[in-house]
Amino acid sequence: MGSHMTGENGQLALLDITVEFTGGLEMLFSNQRKHKISLPSLDITGAPSNIAYLIKYLCQNLMKDERKELFVLDDSVRPGILVLINDADWELEGEEQYRIQQNDNILFVSTLHGG
């Protein structure tokens, strides 16, 4: 394992990132739009953390609401949720396979509005 994956004491390195939710998604995350989190740099399989892992991590560790189906469908974000990585559409960045970098800003925007 390279030094960029572990800290000085051999612990798994953490990626400090900002995750934001808008368009109503914030209600699933304690009504808080912006969250600063420290994400493990490797997922449970030992692969570099990517957006797919972040989505699972958010559901398991940050989402307080039981209605996960409003955010995820089949282990991916629901259709109608835009994902921006450092202000760029995630489709330009490789979608779920994008490898998360230190200080990334990931924005989830719901385009679905109930009436």
From Swiss-Prot:
Pathway: tRNA modification; 5-methoxycarbonylmethyl-2-thiouridine-tRNA biosynthesis. Keywords: Cytoplasm, Isopeptide bond, tRNA processing, Ubl conjugation pathway. Its main location: cytoplasm. There is a cross-link at G115 (Glycyl lysine isopeptide (Gly-Lys) (interchain with K-? in acceptor proteins)). One of its GO terms (cellular component) is cytosol. InterPro entries: Beta-grasp_dom_sf, Mopterin_synth/thiamin_S_b, Urm1. GO terms for biological process: protein urmylation; tRNA thio-modification; tRNA wobble uridine modification. The keyword Signal does not apply. C-terminal thiocarboxylation occurs in 2 steps, it is first acyl-adenylated (-COAMP) via the hesA/moeB/thiF part of UBA4, then thiocarboxylated (-COSH) via the rhodanese domain of UBA4. The modification 1-thioglycine is found at G115. Pfam families: Urm1 (PF09138). PANTHER family: RURM1 PROTEIN (PTHR14986). Belongs to the URM1 family. This is Ubiquitin-related modifier 1. It comes from Coccidioides immitis (strain RS) (Valley fever fungus). The gene is URM1.
